[in-house]
Amino acid sequence: MATWLAILLIIVALIGGLVGGFFLARKYMMDYLKKNPPINEEMLRMMMMQMGQKPSQKKINQMMTMMNKNMDQNMKSSKK
């Protein structure tokens, strides 16, 4: 009778570890992306120049603000 209990506890521990690991990794990645966004002003300026646009600082600031606001909304909606 102790054998099946040991097997059951091992399975429960594995499932608990997987779920806990998933949520810890998810939180770590969200914090990492918030601190180190995947795109910065210099990358945005280069992309606009490659598309044939002349990037002004005002336009770059608007796009960065829009991207940051979008990322914040996505993080808030994923927390629910």
Curated annotation (Swiss-Prot):
UniProt key word Membrane: yes
Bilayer-spanning residue ranges: 4-24
Localisation per UniProt entry: Membrane
Protein name, entry field: UPF0154 protein SH1564
Domain of life of the organism encoding this protein: Bacteria
Family: Belongs to the UPF0154 family.
InterPro entries in the cross-refs: EF-hand-dom_pair, UPF0154
UniProt KW keywords: Membrane, Transmembrane, Transmembrane helix
Membrane topology: Single-pass membrane protein
Highest classification ranks of the organism: Bacteria, Bacillati, Bacillota, Bacilli, Bacillales
Gene Ontology CC entries for this record: plasma membrane
SUPFAM superfamilies: EF-hand (SSF47473)
Pfam families xrefs: UPF0154
